[in-house]
Amino acid sequence: MNRTKSSKRWLQEHFDDVYVKKAQAEGYRSRAVYKLKEIDDKESLIKPGMTVVDLGASPGGWTQYASEKMKGSGRLVALDILPMDALPNVEFILGDFREDNVLQELINLIPQRTLDLLLSDMAPNMSGSSAIDIPRAMYLVELAFDFAEKMLKPGGNMLVKIFHGSGFDELVKQARASFEKVVIRKPSASRSRSKETYLLAKGYNL
């Protein structure tokens, strides 16, 4: 019964959500696009000619926005464990980023030290228990960070979803040791009750 009430409440919030309505009106696949757009408007992360990887891409809001900003030049690779409808000038990998063969498929597409920007909106399936969800989420951040350290070119940038909890401070410290600028962003489109924030790391140092 509680789950039914919770589901109804979530659906009501979803359909009343200004960002959901905005995404529908502007032809975007998800409200999440406005999280990336707000940060990109301030930081100018995405430009034509770049090589960009988008992890946790489905249904494709971030990828769609990046594709528009890149204007058909450069290379944009999206990856997700869930299917995603095709987008112009986007290469899509269907698979679990945690699996070695999927990671290798991605590495094969992007020559080492040529990546300009890593985007990651990856999140685990949430159980509702912070003791379970936060470590799972942090593991995904760690995997994304490891990939960035192997693939980013000098001066490259990274934007990853990160949840407040155990391991948060350590990951921020690690990022500050490898990048010139590290900040935490909470975009307006992130729901206030959510523990999600975004770690922006700019200027990768080899």
Curated annotation (Swiss-Prot):
Please state the protein's primary subcellular location: cytoplasm
What InterPro entries does the database record attribute to this sequence? RNA_methyltr_RlmE (IPR050082), RNA_MeTrfase_FtsJ_dom (IPR002877), rRNA-MeTfrase_E (IPR015507), SAM-dependent_MTases_sf (IPR029063)
Keyword annotations from UniProtKB, A to Z: Cytoplasm, Methyltransferase, rRNA processing, S-adenosyl-L-methionine, Transferase
The active site is formed by K161
Q: What class of enzyme is it?
A: transferase
Reaction(s) catalysed by this chain, per the record, are: uridine(2552) in 23S rRNA + S-adenosyl-L-methionine = 2'-O-methyluridine(2552) in 23S rRNA + S-adenosyl-L-homocysteine + H(+)
| Annotated EC | 2.1.1.166
Any one Gene Ontology cellular component term annotated for this protein: cytoplasm
- Compartments reported by the entry: Cytoplasm
Identify one Pfam family in the record: FtsJ
Q: Which GO terms describe its molecular function?
A: rRNA (uridine-2'-O-)-methyltransferase activity
Specify whether S-adenosyl-L-methionine is a keyword of the entry: yes
| Residues that, per the record, bind S-adenosyl-L-methionine | G60, W62, D80, D96, D121
In terms of superkingdom, the source organism counts as Bacteria
Functionally, this protein is described as follows: Specifically methylates the uridine in position 2552 of 23S rRNA at the 2'-O position of the ribose in the fully assembled 50S ribosomal subunit.
- What NCBIfam families does the entry give? PRK11188.1
Q: Give the similarity note.
A: Belongs to the class I-like SAM-binding methyltransferase superfamily. RNA methyltransferase RlmE family.
Please identify the protein, giving its name as recorded. Ribosomal RNA large subunit methyltransferase E
Q: Which organism is it from?
A: Legionella pneumophila (strain Lens)
